[in-house]
């Protein structure tokens, strides 16, 4: 074991939730309207974008995943706004002396169209994380009718974060 402390850490996050009736469709803190009135199933609000960012942040510091901190077995987190959870995760990251350098996320969904809401999502995330929204990249794509996202069974998100050690 050496005494080397890296200046940067990279984290990768992924989340997917099933589309169901009777639930809201919250992505990046934005309540979207699905053409078939579907929403994402989950214990919290099932915000795949916010969940994948949280997992990337935790993973960058080898702190486990969001289930460790907000287990679905705990009713305290039932239907909670994921931006509240994100604020708890970023507090943990900062207590360890790290800051976000940037975030890059890719949402995968056939419908609804995500692009018109990207700037609002970035604003919600940047306000929660207390970073400039230029540090956050959000892209949306389809799966070309392939896989669970392509069959409109669910929506997923991949995120990468770069953390920098504060001096």
UniProtKB/Swiss-Prot annotation:
Annotated catalysed reactions: 4-CDP-2-C-methyl-D-erythritol 2-phosphate = 2-C-methyl-D-erythritol 2,4-cyclic diphosphate + CMP
Pfam families according to UniProt: YgbB (PF02542)
Xref: CDD domains: MECDP_synthase (cd00554)
Name of the protein: 2-C-methyl-D-erythritol 2,4-cyclodiphosphate synthase
UniProt gene name: ispF
Family: Belongs to the IspF family.
Reported cofactor(s): a divalent metal cation
Biological function: Involved in the biosynthesis of isopentenyl diphosphate (IPP) and dimethylallyl diphosphate (DMAPP), two major building blocks of isoprenoid compounds. Catalyzes the conversion of 4-diphosphocytidyl-2-C-methyl-D-erythritol 2-phosphate (CDP-ME2P) to 2-C-methyl-D-erythritol 2,4-cyclodiphosphate (ME-CPP) with a corresponding release of cytidine 5-monophosphate (CMP).
Taxonomic path: Bacteria, Bacillati, Cyanobacteriota, Cyanophyceae, Synechococcales
Species of provenance: Prochlorococcus marinus (strain MIT 9312)
Marked site: Transition state stabilizer: 43, 142
Domain of life: Bacteria
Complexes and interactors: Homotrimer.
A GO molecular-function descriptor: metal ion binding
